[in-house]
Amino acid sequence: MQKTKFPFEILIHDDASTDGTQEIIREYEQKYPDIIKPIYQAENQYSKGIKINLTYNFPRAKGKYIAFCEGDDYWTAPDKLQKQVDFLESHLDYVMCSHRYRLYFQKEGRIDDEIRPIENLSDGKEFDLSFLIRGGWLFQTLSVVFRRTVIDLNELFKYTMQIDAVLYYVFLKKGKGYCMPDVMGVYRVHDAGVWSSLNLNHQRMFSLKARKAIYDVEKTDEAALFILSQFSRPMGRIQVIREYSMFVRITKILIAHFGAGFVLRMWIDRLLFNKKLCVNEFYQIEDFCRRKKIR
């Protein structure tokens, strides 16, 4: 349990689990009725396309801040919430705060450092929307605390997909984020996980679809750049063929923002050489969009 100087509530949505989870939740609900506030579903809602947090959790959240911890993951520091809330209380221009974490590979019983650690940054790192658009990623769901004021349900329901990338894009439109250097949680990797069960090609396709969902609402250069940062990564040719219609739609978006010549060259690099866009090229495109916006 977390040790904090402030009260908190734990909002749980049990999506018709059948593995004994409900019994465990009920046990803790009886012990801490003022803290544990569950919803028990008789039928799985996620499989029906229901956006769980938007429908069941965000509307009933009363706190000034919201933190995530999905059922597969866990926190390891008892002062995690206190540290993050203290930071946000003293830095009003930040809308979210994350921290470092470790990976638990359940099949092997192995715990490793995260895939993309912060190097030589003992004081942590600030990040913004531009960082996210360029492919930066300094958070897992279990590590994030954010201000409840950044939640606008009417805005979020416009997006057809409701995954991490969409939420963080919306949050970072409204302010900066900060990643603490402290390791305060563990992300579980296992075959039954929604994300970790996908192979690399499917993960990249899923991310690409999420970015298109953002563009369908935003229709800005920034949203197109967010597509580009994912689109430029190598992906299996078979996957491209299978998702042909999706790639056609994305190609039209990129041509509208960056020109047919550039997109054609990128397609040739992808299909013939399986190359991705280099960092300097991406920065040049980002700078072009910024100057176009200023004009």
Regions found by a protein language model. Name each.
Residues 79-113:
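Conserved donor NDP-sugar-binding/catalytic core segment of glycosyltransferases
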Residues 66:
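Short aromatic/hydrophobic "clamp" motif used to bind/position activated sugar donors
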Residues 70-74:
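The conserved acidic donor/metal-binding loop of glycosyltransferases
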Residues 22-26, 63, 76-89:
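Short alpha-helix within the catalytic core of nucleotide-sugar-dependent glycosyltransferases
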